[in-house]
Amino acid sequence: MIEAIGNQYVVARPVYSTKAFGEEFKKTYGHHKTFLDHLKGCCSCSSQKAKKIALSLFPIASWLPAYKIKEWLLSDIVSGISTGLVAVLQGLAFALLVNIPPAYGLYAAFFPVITYFFLGTSRHISVGPFPVLSMMVGVVVTRVASGSDTSPALSSSSAENDSMIEEKVMVAASVTVLSGIIQLLLGVLQIGFVVIYLSESLISGFTTAAAIHVLVSQLKFMLQLTVPAHSDPFSIFKVLESVFSQIQKTNIADLVTSVIILVVVFVVKEINQRYRSKLPVPIPIELIMTVIATGISYGCNFEQRFGVAVVGNMSLGFQPPITPSVEVFQDTIGDCFGIAIVGFAVAFSVASVYSLKYDYPIDGNQELIALGVSNIFTGAFKGFAGSTALSRSGVQESTGGKTQVAGLLSAVIVLIVIVAIGFLLQPLQKSVLAALALGNLKGMLMQFAEIGRLWKKDKYDCLIWIMTFIFAIVLGLGLGLAASVAFQLLTIVFRTQFPKCSTLANVGRSNIYKNKKNYADVYEPEGVKIFRCPSPIYFANIGFFKQKLIDAVGFNPLRILRKRNKALKKIRKLQKQGLIQVTPKGFICTSDGFKDSDEELDNNQIEELDQPINTTDLPFEIDWNADLPLNITIPKISLHSLILDFSAVSFLDISSMRGLRTILQEFIRIKVDVYIVGTDDDFIDKLARCEFFDDEVTDSIFFLTIHDAILHIWMKKDYSTSKFNSSQEKERKFDFTINTNGGLRNRECQVPVETKF
């Protein structure tokens, strides 16, 4: 019965052990499906199920028929044009990160948008080149392509021959296709949950480090220096060394141009950010600066007068599709897996933000399929891996984009550049593209502010951020990502291996139990210790759990058990020698000349001392806290009951079960009653299946709550120390109440409680 009195509540119910609760309230068991049942469900087909699968694979079929032309079309047109112009410039700029000619960036900006239009579940993200992925692909291209020597004049008109360019394009395309295959397989197998191993802190630290890599990689274009390519660990430092060793060769025209572009882009982007509520659309500063820079470069003939590196020949139209290289697959499968996971993690996180903002569902596994098909399609046409760029998606959403129709129209803009007006960009300086690429890094570089916020919120997450950043900077993006995931998992192991165990006490003279160190006014029942473990118990932390429990109770139960068994052996020995007599009233000493000795025992004798104490041959029960005859001394303990709060223990493994049973047996053998509270039924069922229980450790030690166990302990002690009338002993009904002045228990009967154990 629950009764509310003002802002308080009074509960009158029986004291339940888990076993008693199960006897009174029968569980309902649902039908357990076998593997064959699941297989039949997967293989069965109906018209409704077929329709559901079709809508799942092609989400466009669900939202396109409901498209509101009058309300959404104009917004999507404006958004599509704006996003398309940004996509063109980002495609050209991010191609430099891949170490291939800028024209191939247009393919990466076109093809994934088409496939995502049909297969994607997000209505607002813009799929295409992303600087972090471009950098990761570029690292692989640098490592795999033979004789890769990245120079600022990277185009078909440069000193680098056509075969070298084709090899780099082949490597980038093959890596993209394999990454797409991995994403497609993960989506088909419905294991998109792998992205959960990349926490927000890890992604933030990784993308920040990738932004630093992008920044360093673009220095050679901004300064027009010939910098050897590096892809091994510490490559970023080697690139910096190469840059500064030839800094005197800097092309001043490229440097001045890139600095001006960079400053203007940063300033205008800040204006867009601060006044986004007042501006109808963000100022397309990248487009404006590109048009101005192209016009000035062409009109003043920068290429001839100052020797600047320009985009160069832009062949119109598409190139024929290619067959990926199996050799590249074999050499880059690890890198491709990292590219696939990072690409999906970034895209899904951005899509999740917009889905929450506009209240529509997204499907992680379908997103994997959409991105996988997009990358396969893009790689086949000589593009490179893509995801979603935060800045480009922000443009699509902020300019009024409602659906992926805006994305389709942005692809039309890219298509026009590819087939018709791409030649107009030939005079554009590569330093301008490098500056535009860096201009899009502001958001990622600002993530350094996360360190302070994370330190205040969670030091483990802050450490993950810092170590991820260091790993990605020092080891490179591929190895850095693997090391970061390993370190993150290690922190999880560390948290569970060394949990913050605590001793609980009663707070407020009620049924609330908290860490006694955190509160001044607490009540700790005499002879009772309440110990809480806030993590799973498994093979790695069972030893730590035992030591913390020993520290909490103040003694080692195994040592006490051995001392008592050893004392019992001495008593029997003295009895045989006639030095003491054992009577029902206790021990009678017949001599006082015995000296206690603590001789060493062999292994067999130690094993005997670990067994339960057997006093059946004695006419009375030994009080181990009383003085023993003839100076036989053993440690005295006041603890009679131990409560283990397992409400936060989600699982036990086989190794920890053995260790836990040993711990419980040691306490039980020294007459300390052990109770476990807060576990669910599955936990106890697993213990039963694993043969955890025996004659000493039974399932009667489990109680629903700490307070149930406390009341049971008090009533149990009352039974053994008090005399009751026959009706009370028969029905075992006693009355307890909460006394806010003197403690939890009051002998005056006010609240009837039925005792069950």
Curated annotation (Swiss-Prot):
The chain crosses the membrane at residues 72-92, 94-114, 125-145, 177-197, 202-222, 251-271, 279-299, 336-356, 368-388, 405-425, 463-483. A motif (PDZ-binding) lies at residues 754-757. CDD domains: STAS_SulP_like_sulfate_transporter. It comes from the Eukaryota. GO terms for cellular component: apical plasma membrane; brush border membrane; membrane; plasma membrane; sperm midpiece. Its main location: membrane. Keywords: Antiport, Cell membrane, Chloride, Glycoprotein, Membrane, Transmembrane, Transmembrane helix, Transport. Mediates chloride-bicarbonate exchange with a chloride bicarbonate stoichiometry of 2:1 in the intestinal epithelia. Plays a role in the chloride and bicarbonate homeostasis during sperm epididymal maturation and capacitation. Belongs to the SLC26A/SulP transporter (TC 2.A.53) family. Interacts with PDZK1, CFTR, SLC26A6 and NHERF1. Interacts (via PDZ-binding motif) with NHERF4 (via the third PDZ domain); interaction leads to decreased expression of SLC26A3 on the cell membrane resulting in its reduced exchanger activity. This is Chloride anion exchanger. It comes from Rattus norvegicus (Rat). The gene is Slc26a3.
